[in-house]
Amino acid sequence: EMDIPGYNPVFPVPADKLEELIPLIEDARRPVIYAGGGIISAEASGELLEFAERSQIPVATTLMGIGAMPETHPLSLRWLGMHGAVFANNAVNEADLVIALGARFDDRVTGAVNMFCPESTIVHIDIDASEINKNKKVAYPIRANVKDALQVLNSALAAKGWERRSSGFTRTPEWFGVIDGWKKQYPFSYEDRKGYIAPQAVIEELYRQTADKDPIICTGVGQHQMFAAQFFKFDKPRRLATSGGLGTMGYGLPASMGACLAYPDRLVVNIDGDGSMLMNIQELATIHVERLPVKCIILNNQHLGMVVQWEDLKYDSNRAQTFLADPHDNYDPTHKTEDVIYPNYPLICAGFGVKCERVLRIEELPAAITRMIESPEAYVLDVMVPHDVHVLPMILGGMSYKDVILERIAGDGSAKKASELGKEIPTAL
C-alpha cells in the first residue's frame, strides 16, 4: 500500500448557503445542471443522479464530465461545448437557472463568455475557490466539495417531500417539451456516403457490440476523440479516458495500457487517429512484452483531421503539413488502392508482434470489430475513413451557441448556421 503525500482540502460545508438554493430551484421554469469533471473527481456521480431525479432538472456535462450522469437517462442532455449536442448548448444558454457543479466555464464550453447564459441566474459550486468567478461572474458562488454539497441539497429536497423520479417528470413540463423538440430535431448525426466508411459509423458499431460489456474507452486527441464522445454513450464515470483539458495527442495508447493493468478482466478499447497513434506507437512493444490485451481502432484518414477541418473553415482548404500519406504515391482518398496506403500499420504492428487488420469497406466492419473484441490478445483495426469529414455540430471560438455550424464547410466558407435558420430552431426565451 502506497502513502503518497498530497493536498487534501477539508473545510466545512456551507449548509446555510446551500439551503438558500432550494427556493431558486422551486421557482425556476427553465433549470439546467451543468456538471463538470469535478463530479467524477469527487466520486459524486451517485449524488448527482439523486439530485437530478429529485429536482427533475436535466443535466448537461462537459467533455471531462462524461459518464457523471448516465447518458441514456431521460434527464441527460449528453454534453455541451464546441462539438457538444445542440440541445445541450441550447438548454444551458436558455436556462433561467444554471447550477454549475465541479465545472470551470472554460472557453470550449462558453464560447464568447459575454454571450454565455445571458439571462441565467448561475450557481457555481466548486472545491477550488480560484475557479469561482474566474471566467464567468455568478450570482451564487459556493466553495465546497461537490459531493458534500449535493448530499446537503438532496437531504433538503427529501425533507420537503421531493421524491426521486427516473421518468414521468411533472415539474416544468413546458421546458421539457422545448428540450424534447431540440433533441428530435438536432440529434448527433452524420452523412452516410456510399463507398466510404463514416468514422461515426465505426463508433456506433463498436457501441452496439460492446455496450453490455461495460468497456473502458480511451482516446487520443483529434476528430476521433469527438466522434467517440458523440456516438458512444457512457452510463458510468471513468469509462472514458481522454485528454480534454490539455488535449494531448498520443494519450490514448498509454492510457489504455494503464486501464488494462488496473482492470485486467475488463474490455479496454483505444479509439485513435492515425496522427495521434503515431505519437506513441512505440508502446506497442510494451503491450506485446507485457501481454496487455489492448484493443485499438485507428480511424485512419491519412491526415491530421481536426487541423484539416480548421483549414477548411479558415484557410479555403489550403493544406499545410496536415497530409500524412506518402507524398511520392498517388494518394487515393477512396482507399481502394490498398498498396499506396501509408504508413503500413499492419506491417508496423507485425514488427511489434501485434495483430493488425485493415478494414476498407463498411460491410467488413461488424465482423472485424467482433474479431477484435473476441481476441484474447492485443488487436489493432486500421479502419480507412475519408479525410474530408467534419466534426459537427461546431461552435467557433468567440462565438455563441446561436452561431453553431450544422453542415460541413465546403472550403468556400459557406455553411448553414443556427443563426441563419431563424424560426427553424425553437427557443425558450
Model-predicted segments: where are they?
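Active-site diphosphate/adenylate-binding microenvironment
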Residues: 176-254, 259
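Glycine-rich phosphate/diphosphate-binding loops that line cofactor/substrate pockets in enzymes
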Residues: 17-31, 51, 92-94, 205-215, ...
